Amino acid sequence: MRSNALLIQGRNLLLAATCAVGCASSAADTDVDEGAFSSNEAVLLEFEFDGEVVSDSPWKPIDDQLLYTVGQLNGERSVGRLDTVKLTNVEQSATQNGETRIRYHAVLQVAWGNPRTIPASYTFVLPRSVGYAAQRSFTEQHKHECVDWGAHDVDEGSMWYYYRPLNDGCALADAEVVKSVATVRRSSEQTTDKYPEYQKIWEDGRLEVIAIFGKYKDGATSNDAGISAYNEFADMLRTEFARAKGTVTTTPASIPRAPGIGAPDITYEAALGDGKVIKVTALLVDNIGAAPESFDRRYEVLSPTADLIAYNGHAGLGQNVRALAQKGRWKTGQYQVFFMNGCDTFAYVDGTLAGTRAALNPDDPTGTKYMEFVTNAMPSFFTSMPEASRAIVKGFLSYEQPMTYEQIFKGIDRAEVVLVTGEEDNVYRPGMPLGNR
């Protein structure tokens, strides 16, 4: 995700600086995914192609190579869903120098952020060899001309993220890369006009929200884009709850105007005019991947009854997204929406939570009946994060005039290319009775 701090350095330069933190390598294996897809900025496509990769290590070389699709597709305002890629016809052979050559057939789902210009085919230009030494050499040779123009501190651990092989001036020798021409088609999993399950959100008469904000820099105490985003969201809560018709309670009883690290756990709760209740808890952490046990315990208290869980901060190139998916406690039949608001989170979300929810709910074998994931196909600014979380909260509060996901997403910075998965089995339509009215 990007920061608007120090605008003098330029918007794209900060994107590079922010997204470079916390690189993660390959996506986790999973047998369950969140299913279909809806967005007001992107269309879901399937890219089918034959690939080839060489490596001196047997440890997931295909995964390592496909990571470079993140960078290339980001250059097209798009990104692929790595954990659900379908691989067939995988064949291994030895090269003359003792390395392993793997040929494979792949079908990659892509959130394509240019819905008005859908190509019939697309050429991936991926590194041929992904061994450690080969990636280091590839990075050293091409970390200036073949990366996003704002990238910096590029190394073999982040080259795949900034990789832009279609740049003017990017000269890649045929021996260095594999050019795979993908056939492109629309995915049958694209949906439109799907609503959140308002009848499930409000069946107990309460909307409970957890909004987590990660710092831009671990250990920061001030002058930090993540802390500023947290403070801005707290100010939004103060303003919105001041309009509540019922009594407003806060924890702590007195919340500073800029709570920051002095009050990293705040809650607003109020009764609405028709008897419904809204409760929003905002939390500030360094980063999810290294969060202390105190955060885990607090999250376990809040998560079972939460209707919306929004994480705003570094994706850590997938690390923080997957770390949050492994935390919390869940309740049978509890419908929940997760908003993973960080860099390219569509690429990094795996099936961990879907699998957990499927095991918890016998009537939900796919793990999507009681859960949706809202993710980004592109990065997001820290300064956009408070408004993005508020947009979804406001959408859920709009039960008198229900909003589709596409309508809700109009309140979010379009640069993020936000989308939802898991909504394909939603049944809510306007006019359906809610819980406590």
Predicted features and spans:
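Bacterial N-terminal signal peptides that target proteins for export
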Residues: 2-14
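C-terminal motif of bacterial Sec signal peptides marking the signal peptidase cleavage site
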Residues: 20-22
